[in-house]
Amino acid sequence: MSEQQMDLKDLMPTKRKYMWKTAEDRRMSDLTCVLEWLERRQGKKKQAPEKQKPKVVTVLKRNKKKEEKKGKGLMTARGGNRRDTETSQQALGKRFRKDAASYRSLYGVEQKGKHLSMVPGSYIKDGPKKSDTDIKDAVDPESTQRPNPFRRQSIVLDPMLQEGTFNSQRATFIRDWSNKMPDMAYERKLKSLMEKSTEPKMETMRMLKPEEVLSCRYLRLSKENIRTLLKLCKDAGMNVDIHPHMVEEDIDAKKVFTGIPSMAL
């Protein structure tokens, strides 16, 4: 019985995994697990390319053999077309050389060994440096070839030249103005005639009769207007039955004008 008890005790764990471990122990155990996993992963990565290398080499060797066989077959089949291909290649090479030469001459590309430099010849360090006199000589013909027509008058230093240019301009301006003067006068006359013909003729204002004034529906008579009407009627010798306090609706032309209605004021 004692032996069986001892065996059972050996089988049972003396520690529980999570109860007696501190936080530091747990952290360290996690770190060790992570490190082991990383080592395993790196070892797998290193082994993978080593295993794949011989396969690639064998595949390349097979492809090379196939290409060599194909090339031999093509050479035997296209034996008669070799000369045509060579002539076409020579023509292409000549054309390419011509294009390269024209490109260099246009854009200033100079050849240095195998490489081409895009820097123009005037800015290359190894090239011959131009002196100040050469630069001035190159600038002078450009300035003479391209005269600026919009140059300011202040650039001319000699006052006599300035006076001559101004006098010539004045003379040309006066000539043009004198030639245009009769045309301008003629145009003014034409404009005045056209305006006179288009102007509406002013008609003489016709004096309204009191009957017409009072029979207007939309007329609002003020006190002053009614007074003036009364004066006009009295001056004309008409007896008018109207007073300033009357409303427009109360005014009736037939009752107001009992005398001669056709008589003008």
UniProtKB/Swiss-Prot annotation:
Q: Which cysteines are joined by disulfide bonds?
A: none
Identify the coding gene. Answer: C16orf78
Q: Name one Pfam family in it.
A: DUF4638
> Where are the residues of the annotated region Disordered?
62-94, 118-149
The entry's cellular-component GO terms read:
nucleus
Judging by the UniProt lineage, the source's domain of life is Eukaryota
Quote the protein name from its UniProt record: Uncharacterized protein C16orf78
Q: Which ranges are annotated Basic and acidic residues under compositional bias?
A: 126-139
Coiled-coil positions are: none
